[in-house]
Every structure is written in structure tokens, then in C-alpha cells.
Amino acid sequence: MKVALGFRPHSGWAAAVAVHADPTQGVLERRRVALADLPPPVQPYHEAAGLDPGEAAALVEQATTAAYGAAGAELSTLVDRLRAAGHEVVAAGVAAGPGTVREDLPLDRVLAAHGTLHAAEGELYRDVLVDAAGGLGLPVTLVPPREVPALARQLLGLDDGSVRALLTELGRPHGPPWTRDHKDATVAALLALDPQPVRARAGPAAAPSAAGPGRRPGAGRRSRPARHR
């Protein structure tokens, strides 16, 4: 059966699920995936804020390279396991916004404000997931977390209460923890299988590229992680 992966990233890790194309069939797998290898810090931009420019750039580069490597290894293991069990992994959804602070600002400006520090770290761990999934040939759909409830209602054709009940029930076989992170990741996976609601809300900019629905430019190129000017 076709399945999709769903992720809700945080600094250094992500909640991950694998979901059947038919949501009534439940969540196949729930796990926490590591997106950072030690010793590089899991919050490299925060750590770099107090360093001189050369040291800051080196730290961010080291942590970025480690994060891309960790994400690639984790997703490869997860996909291999699902495929070995007879599942066809066809897409991935990431519950994360489309910000581009890391691409748009030089490192010194990112490090100058608390808001851009947080934004850059969120984008880093989103980007490594998008890149790792793309490297495995999976089209990726980005789902802004604030839009998860509305998109879930539209996709499933249910009201808020029914959506919450369904998401709770889907996680019941796995037991606790089954948190909002896991539910957001589940919705992201379902939207990866049917991204039309995401495209409709986002407008023409969200139209699928040749690489697949919701893919960001450059995704899947682990040899070229985003670098600051």
C-alpha cells in the first residue's frame, strides 16, 4: 500500500510518522528522528551569536553539514524499513513554514536578532528533511503549522471536533506519547499524498514543480546545503 512520511521538525530532531494513503488504516509508524550529530550544537545559530565572524561561520557550517548527514541517514533507514515491509513510500510532508531567512540574509544579520536566530534554526531543520526526502526521490509538501487545522478540515471533509477525534484515534494503537507534533506530522503526510488543499490556499506559488508538489528549489541536493553569504 502507498504510504507517506510526515515530519514536525524541532532543533536537532523531528517527530516522524508513516501514514497509509487511506487515513482510516491508521499510522504505520511513529518515531523520533535525530537531525543533529554531536558534538556540533543543535542550536548552531544561537551558539554562534557570541563568536567572532570567522568562528561563527565555521560553527554554523559544521553544524549544517552534520544535520544534512544525520537527516539523510535517518530517512534512508526509515524508508528502507518501510519498503522491506512491503510498503510503497511515495511522498513526504513537513509541517514547517516557507521562510527563507537563511537564503536571504548574510550570517551577521541572522545572528543580530533573536527572531532571525529562531527562524534560521527552524529553516535549517526543515531544509535537511526536505533535502533528505528529495534525495530519496520523494516529492515534498510543506505545510505551515498554523494552517494545519484548516487544511485538515478541507482535506478530510470534517469539522474541527471530528478532525481532532480522528487524529487522536489514529495514534491510539501506538500509545503515548501522541502529541500535537505527531498529529501535525500525520496531517502533513496526508497532505503530501493529496496536496491540492495546500496549493489552493497558497495560490500559484505553490503549484508543483517538475520535482514534485511543494518541493523547494534545490531540495534533494545534499552536496549543496544552503550557505550564508
Kindly label every feature range from the protein language model.
Residues M1-A200, R227-R229:
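Phosphate- and other anionic-substrate recognition elements at nucleic-acid/protein interfaces
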Residues R201-R227:
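Compositionally biased, low-complexity flexible segments
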